[in-house]
């Protein structure tokens, strides 16, 4: 029996009490929870129920009766349609406060820990919270009689929203994407049709090295074929000298994953170079690298502050990617070991260590939950561990290993407060949470990065 007093299509007044982990407003109607995208804490609004469930209602914002002083006009023309950003309508200082609150909400929801007893610091923000993303992944679509559009899927849909400019992207990523889009249209290159499973071009991926100016273009295709390849490469070379690497990645899977397993060089170099904390890093097409290079240095500074190192420690860099975090600390410890499941990332990490003159690092391809126990069996025990997992959080096998290893210091770098809280609840058996430091890596969105210091009990 439906206990929810709200009916679909019903319109009713609501006071927004709080904002949720996805940036939506939360209010209560006859004690039932109502989620309202676009509403801000303290606002009095009129909403319309669009989805009614037993325990909650999703509603759309119809009218604002009392506006929050933190409400601003979103500068992006496709903000409400796109779904890539959730907080452009919120003043930036209020965004930072919300992100700290998102961490608190996650602790409340997923653990029995009282967040009031934790030291959760104010969020570290950006001076200029725009144009920060160094990588774009724009889907393609054919419309009308041969017109090609590029953009992002709308929130919770597979409807492409065409985007001419994205104001959180580095300008060069948009410039290259738009140029390639026009080339695809000019030469009539077949665009992938998701429903039919036909066509070739699925996605245009562009990544730039902000400090080096080197830019990589990746054609994500449905087959190894790339019609008009020679003509397009010639035009790109002539018009876009900043593009120093052009790759093709083949993804024939019917899934939402961007990349497939097969990548090959079309022109230029296999990778681009980026600089971070006075180190140089090669980035291949599939390798993970933080999307906001400006805040990445702030993030790593917070990791550095968290760890107490004398120079005699062994350090594990789990989910190491191209080796950025571990190599930033290599000069402060006896040995760094890192692992990652993407072979190209490990190749990049090894090459980066050589390039940076670092010889006390060791890298291995594999899952962190498999590799760490293997190392322990071989007699290696880390004094400190840094984990920087994907949004899904740490694998339960890795959590088990971390509890067995009992490293003196554990720094958890998280991009998802919900999975962070879930993992902290388990790690709390052997580790004490010293503090949590939110860092705003993705301004204008509801995403928050958190550096958490844990010490062995």
Curated annotation (Swiss-Prot):
The domain of life is Bacteria
- Is Mitochondrion found in the keyword set? no
For biological process, the GO terms are:
rRNA base methylation
* Enzyme nomenclature, EC number: 2.1.1.-
Keywords carried by this UniProt record? 4Fe-4S, Iron, Iron-sulfur, Metal-binding, Methyltransferase, S-adenosyl-L-methionine, Transferase
Q: Where does [4Fe-4S] cluster bind?
A: 76, 82, 85, 166
Cited Pfam families: TRAM (PF01938), tRNA_U5-meth_tr (PF05958)
Chain sites annotated for binding S-adenosyl-L-methionine: 290, 319, 340, 388
GO MF entries: 4 iron, 4 sulfur cluster binding; metal ion binding; rRNA (uridine-C5-)-methyltransferase activity
**Which CDD domains does this entry report, sorted A to Z?**
AdoMet_MTases
Which positions fall inside the TRAM domain?
Answer: 5-63
Active site: residue positions: 415 (nucleophile)
Is the keyword S-adenosyl-L-methionine in the record?
Answer: yes
Q: Which NCBIfam families match?
A: rumA
Q: Write out the similarity annotation.
A: Belongs to the class I-like SAM-binding methyltransferase superfamily. RNA M5U methyltransferase family.
Which protein is depicted?
Uncharacterized RNA methyltransferase lin1815
Species per Swiss-Prot/TrEMBL record: Listeria innocua serovar 6a (strain ATCC BAA-680 / CLIP 11262)
């Amino acid at each position: 029996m439906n206990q929810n007093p709200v009916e679909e299509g019903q319109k009713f007044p609501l006071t927004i009490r709080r904002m949720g982990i996805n940036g939506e407003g939360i209010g209560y109607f006859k004690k039932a929870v109502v989620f309202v995208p676009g509403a801000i804490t303290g606002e009095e609004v009129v909403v319309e129920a669009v989805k009614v469930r037993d325990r909650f209602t999703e509603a759309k914002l119809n009218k604002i009766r009392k506006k929050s002083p933190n409400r601003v006009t979103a500068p992006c023309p496709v903000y409400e349609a796109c779904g890539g950003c959730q907080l452009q309508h919120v003043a930036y200082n209020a965004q930072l406060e919300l992100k700290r609150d998102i961490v608190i909400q996650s602790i409340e929801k997923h653990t029995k820990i009282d967040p009031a007893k934790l030291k959760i610091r104010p969020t570290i923000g950006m001076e200029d919270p725009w144009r920060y993303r160094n990588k774009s992944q724009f889907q393609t679509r054919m419309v009308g009689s041969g017109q090609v559009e590029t953009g992002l899927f709308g929130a919770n849909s597979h409807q492409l929203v065409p985007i001419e400019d994205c104001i959180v992207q580095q300008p060069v990523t948009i410039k290259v994407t738009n140029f390639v889009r026009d080339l695809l249209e000019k030469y009539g290159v077949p665009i992938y049709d998701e429903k039919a499973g036909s066509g070739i071009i699925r996605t245009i991926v562009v990544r730039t090295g902000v400090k080096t100016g080197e830019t990589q273009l990746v054609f994500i295709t449905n087959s190894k074929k790339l019609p008009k390849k020679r003509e397009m490469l010639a035009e790109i070379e002539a018009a876009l000298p900043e593009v120093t690497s052009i790759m093709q990645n083949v993804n024939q899977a019917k899934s939402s994953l961007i990349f497939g397993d097969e990548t090959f060089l079309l022109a230029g170099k296999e990778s681009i170079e980026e600089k971070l904390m006075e180190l140089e890093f090669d980035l291949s097409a599939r390798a993970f690298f933080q999307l906001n290079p400006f805040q990445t240095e702030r993030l790593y500074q917070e990791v550095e502050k968290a760890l107490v190192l004398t120079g005699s420690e062994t350090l594990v860099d789990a989910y190491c990617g191209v080796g950025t975090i571990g190599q930033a600390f290599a000069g402060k410890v006896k040995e760094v070991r890192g692992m990652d499941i993407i072979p190209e990332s490990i190749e990049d990490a090894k090459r980066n260590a050589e390039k940076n003159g670092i010889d006390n690092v060791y890298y291995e391809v594999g899952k962190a939950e498999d590799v760490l126990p293997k190392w322990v069996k071989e007699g290696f025990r880390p004094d400190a561990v840094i984990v920087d997992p994907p949004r899904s959080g740490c694998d339960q096998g890795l959590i088990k290993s971390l509890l067995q290893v009992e490293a003196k210091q554990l720094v958890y770098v998280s991009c998802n407060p919900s999975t962070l809280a879930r993992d902290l609840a388990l790690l709390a058996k052997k580790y004490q949470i010293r503090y949590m430091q939110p860092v705003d890596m993705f301004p204008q969105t509801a995403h928050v990065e958190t550096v958490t210091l844990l010490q062995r009990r």
